[in-house]
Amino acid sequence: MQETSIKRAGASAAASAAPAATVPATASASARKLYIRTFGCQMNEYDSDKMADVLRGDQGLELTDNPEDADVILFNTCSVREKAQEKVFSDLGRVQHLKKLNPDLVIGVGGCVASQEGEAIVKRAPYVDVVFGPQTLHRLPELIRRRRASGASQVDISFPEIEKFDALPPPRIEGATAFVSIMEGCSKYCSFCVVPYTRGEEVSRPFDDVLVEVADLADQGVKEVTLLGQNVNAYRGPMGDTGEIADFATLLEYVHEIPGIERIRYTTSHPKEMTQRMVDAYANLPKLVSFLHLPVQAGSDRVLAAMKRGYTTLEFKSVVRRLRAARPGLTLSSDFIVGFPGETEEDFDKTMKLIEDVGFDTSFSFIYSRRPGTPAADLVDDTPQEVKLRRLQQLQALINAQAAAIAQAMVGTRQRLLVEGPSRRDPNELMGRTENNRIVNFPAPARLIGQMVDVIITDAYPNSLRARVADVDGLAQGNA
């Protein structure tokens, strides 16, 4: 689970493998203030930015780093892991005392835990003022007004489908990267997953709406967009009044033609719906980056069937082979669950073999966590915790070794970066990201921020690379 205190309104597109960025707030001392803490995935980060946009536009709230300064405190939650759920209630307890210091303080809980728990949150934490789901964040101003008018906690965890996108204000951009949500929900109903129950069924944004948003972002200087959805391959966007439906490959083709957009990323995808048209996109669309997050979850067909993933290991490998034939050098990240109910040592060995055969640059790997209301919750969780921990450590060690080998192979190569801002390691240096999602730190002047720059990789580290500028308008190599 990732978590971050959101301190900005514009979304910089962080990699799925990277921790969320922390950017200082710029609120004036006199402005009413908003504090948002975000748990979980990139969709939640996107939603948190939208919460900030909505409340800034309607109530003039500006973001703050400090919950003690806030007039509104929001927790945007994740229910994928059990500990993440409990973490929310722990953090709620830490801000409860602020109500005594500021009786007008509004405390809200949004996201997937809110969608799953609803009224139960208020029963467990009666000082919570508003509870809202991922599909109702645009109603936050009205929920807050109702709370202040009535004195009663407000709960809205409905699924109003496309209404959210129609109601959200235009994004305020800071930087050359941005998230664009193209759909919500998931209809796959994997046996372990709560997403269909917390975010609803798959609902796609209209095709033209997505293109207009991306074009507007490009006009504001955005060069890289990350298209977001729980399962972007399932995108089926209505094309105006034509009665036609655009699939995800079609959307990518049109986004690719928008002037000013130089890179396209997307997450998350489902192996079952990686169509040949999607594979062909990697051969035909050079702006589509050479990096793909493709969750496999396990390498045992028996476990995959129990998870209701809808594919076999051979089918997954076939998808990977076709992708790499279309785009040589494509790197992959993935998701893995160890200790799924009934997973044997043989099943786990098959997962390790899959990793060895395919090769991954990074992964989100977890010990299975029982989620109430899912089909897998009824299965017997019969793997001892120490065995789960050992398997997780083995799996992560193998993927770390593969990632290190990929990084080392990049030393001496020329890479094209989008420069995102100052380096976190050294504010006198810059940080950019390669096509395959590697963070690169290098000395260069600040005027390069937001630009595409060629560098030569000089060193590889566990979580980043180091480089020197190859050539920028006569800039001396390695010169800051």
Curated annotation (Swiss-Prot):
It comes from the Bacteria. Its cofactor is [4Fe-4S] cluster. The keyword Iron-sulfur applies. InterPro entries: Elp3/MiaA/NifB-like_rSAM, Methylthiotransferase, Methylthiotransferase_CS, Methylthiotransferase_N, Methylthiotransferase_N_sf, MiaB_methiolase, rSAM, rSAM_horseshoe. Its EC number is 2.8.4.3. Residues 408-471 form the TRAM domain. The keyword 4Fe-4S applies. [4Fe-4S] cluster 2 binds at C186, C190, C193. GO terms for cellular component: cytosol. Residues 172-405 form the Radical SAM core domain. Keywords: 4Fe-4S, Cytoplasm, Iron, Iron-sulfur, Metal-binding, S-adenosyl-L-methionine, Transferase, tRNA processing. CDD domains: Radical_SAM (cd01335). [4Fe-4S] cluster 1 binds at C41, C78, C112. One of its GO terms (molecular function) is N6-isopentenyladenosine methylthiotransferase activity. Residues 32-149 form the MTTase N-terminal domain. It catalyses: N(6)-dimethylallyladenosine(37) in tRNA + (sulfur carrier)-SH + AH2 + 2 S-adenosyl-L-methionine = 2-methylsulfanyl-N(6)-dimethylallyladenosine(37) in tRNA + (sulfur carrier)-H + 5'-deoxyadenosine + L-methionine + A + S-adenosyl-L-homocysteine + 2 H(+). It is found in: Cytoplasm. Catalyzes the methylthiolation of N6-(dimethylallyl)adenosine (i(6)A), leading to the formation of 2-methylthio-N6-(dimethylallyl)adenosine (ms(2)i(6)A) at position 37 in tRNAs that read codons beginning with uridine. HAMAP family: tRNA_metthiotr_MiaB. Monomer. Belongs to the methylthiotransferase family. MiaB subfamily. NCBIfam families: miaB-methiolase, MiaB/RimO family radical SAM methylthiotransferase. This is tRNA-2-methylthio-N(6)-dimethylallyladenosine synthase. The gene is miaB.
